[in-house]
Amino acid sequence: MKITDAKVFVGGPGKNYVTVKVMTDSGVYGLGDATLNNRETLPAKYLTDYLVPNLIGMDPRRSEDIWQFLYRGAYFRRGPVAMAAFGAIDMALWDIKGKLADMPLYQLFGGKSRDGAMVYGHATGADLEDLMDSIAHYVEQGYKAVRVQCGIPGMPTASYAVPEERGASKHYISDFSGIRPKTEIWDSGKYLRWMPGALMAIRERFGPDLHILHDVHHRLTPREAAQFAKAVEPVDLYWLEDPTPAEDQAALRLVRQHSTTPIAIGEVFNSIWECNKLIEEELIDFIRVAATYAGGITHVKRIVDLAGLHHVRTGFHGAPSHSPLCMAAHAHLNAWAPNFGIQEYLVLGTPDCDALFPSDHRMEDGMVHVSDAPGLGVDFDEAEAARYEYRPGSHPVVRLTDGTMWDY
């Protein structure tokens, strides 16, 4: 059995999804996701010019050897561009493997560890009352867990994942108005003084059973993060996400020394070598890698296995910067992983997205139920794909009140 060709598609409804289709001489094909948010042409070019020509003639069943070929053969490897490209190919090879075996991927991993995977939605508000309404909306839909983000009084602009006006939704589609990003203003002092009280108000309103998550998006210094994590201990957060810049992993040791608030990190990590020390030293409670950015299913399974040895649970990234193909890979990993924690879930099921990526994965009552179809359980409609062209886009950048560049 040989790989005969592979195609790369860029485009989609509201996002420039990068989709890889690997074809074989048996007629079986596999699909993978290489979407790198607002940098989509980079993995697409890497795939088209370098990786796809090398795949031709290889045996798609040898997914481990191909992964090693892609990774070790690159020499200048790791990083989001390379790992997204490797990840898409690996995902497609697993899809082929499942179709050949006539099994859903979770069966190839070792079978189900659970019947459904708990997900969390994104509740946002321009102010606290607006946020409360958003949380109530998710609770009414059956969600057991909600990430909460809120506008900060006195902050000059809306911040990460917060709408500009009350009652508005925070759109996660790309801003296609041009390459130059918009600027948001951040003030850590205002955040640290106000947010702990807001989180406690949410806990008091919705009671002890709702899982509350909160994302700092890498914006605090180590001392500030330790202070904040300690201050919110009475809230009993399910997790505090990305409290410090991802590059400064020693910062999490300081946070850990001062607080028992669970810590989640990893959506920007591209390999096991960026998180192995955090896991082995048990400085985190949840690992947030994605099958796209972290080199595909093969590599993410290694991370999950290592995490399980150290009581670290999964909480895979699930923003709309991943296509339904990546989310399907996560659904299968979540069904299998004995150390599953929770799955980020933003509804992608618009009519346009469903037409482009037909699937029978289900979400109900705050749980994702994995498809039993062979492989990933998601298809790709090339005729629908022809409707979409690449559009340059951007997401905001962040500056402090004095103009200093800061982490988005």
UniProtKB/Swiss-Prot annotation:
Keywords: Magnesium, Metal-binding. Pfam families: MR_MLE_C, MR_MLE_N. It comes from the Bacteria. The keyword Magnesium applies. The keyword Transmembrane helix does not apply. GO terms for molecular function: magnesium ion binding; mannonate dehydratase activity. GO terms for biological process: amino acid catabolic process; carbohydrate catabolic process. Mg(2+) binds at D215, E241, E267. InterPro entries: D-mannonate_dehydratase-like (IPR034589), D-mannonate_dehydratase_GalD (IPR053379), DgoD-like (IPR034593), Enolase-like_C_sf (IPR036849), Enolase-like_N (IPR029017), Enolase_C-like (IPR029065), Mandel_Rmase/mucon_lact_enz_CS (IPR018110), Mandelate_racemase_C (IPR013342). D-arabinonate binds at H217, E267, R288, H317, E344. Transmembrane segments: none annotated. Belongs to the mandelate racemase/muconate lactonizing enzyme family. GalD subfamily. Has no detectable activity with D-mannonate and with a panel of 70 other acid sugars (in vitro), in spite of the conservation of the residues that are expected to be important for catalytic activity and cofactor binding. May have evolved a divergent function. NCBIfam families: ManoateDhtManD, PRK15072.1. This is D-galactonate dehydratase family member OG2516_05608.
